Structures are given as structure tokens and as C-alpha cells.
Amino acid sequence: MSCQQNQQQCQPPPKCPPKCTPKCPPKCPPKCLPQCPAPCSPAVSSCCGPISGGCCGPSSGGCCNSGAGGCCLSHHRPRLFHRRRHQSPDCCESEPSGGSGCCHSSGGCC
């Protein structure tokens, strides 16, 4: 035999892939999450409800005079001839749309 033939015979065999694939871990059954409670009402600082004393946060235009559930209207200020009304220029005494007394981010009533 020549040296070249001997070298070919002595080469290590190619690596074979393992016969068995690794077993997958057992799948866990999906766990039921506890049902979430109903979403909270808006923060007290954003509402003019009786509980908050009629106070709105600074982003909603200040405080209401009465705690009757009125809502701040920072962008609906009455004109000069409306200043004779008893309500504050930044607030409405009641919810005109029958809302909860909370203010929208834009300052209007719900």
C-alpha cells in the first residue's frame, strides 16, 4: 500500500449527529390569572365630586366653588357679561351631559 492509501484509511470518520434528540420539557398547563377588578374611577384630583370637596387638579383649571359634582371648564370661560352668575368662571355647577362630574383631559365635562 502506498502512503496515500494509508492516510485515507486512517482519517477519523465524520462525526455523526446524535441519534436521540433532546426531549422537550413538558408544557405547563396555562394558569388562570385572577380576574382583574373593574378599572378605577379617575383620580380625585381630576374630579369635582362631593368627596373631593369640589376641587379639580391644576391640569383641569383649578377648583370649583361648590362640591356639588360640578366640573372644571378651563377652556370655556364665560365672557365679561356672564360674570354676574354665581358660578366660578372655571366651573360648571352640574353635569350638563349627565356625567359623573369628572373632567376630561381637555377640561370639559363628561
From Swiss-Prot:
Residue spans with biased composition (Low complexity)?
1-10
What does the record note about the induction of this protein?
Answer: By calcium and UVB.
Q: Which UniProt keywords apply?
A: Keratinization
- The yes or no answer to whether the keyword Manganese is present is no
Q: Spell out the Pro residues composition-biased ranges.
A: 11-22
Q: Where is this region: Disordered?
A: 1-22
Give GO terms for biological process.
epidermis development; keratinization
Can you name one GO molecular function term for this protein?
A: identical protein binding
Q: In which tissues is it expressed?
A: Skin-specific. Expression was readily detected in adult trunk skin, adult arm skin, fetal skin, penal skin, vulva, esophagus and tongue. Not expressed in the cervix, rectum, lung, colon, or placenta.
Q: Which residues form a coiled coil?
A: none
What this protein is reported to do is described as: Precursors of the cornified envelope of the stratum corneum.
| Stated family | Belongs to the LCE family.
UniProt miscellaneous comment: Belongs to the LCE cluster present on 1q21.
What's the protein called, per UniProt? Late cornified envelope protein 2B
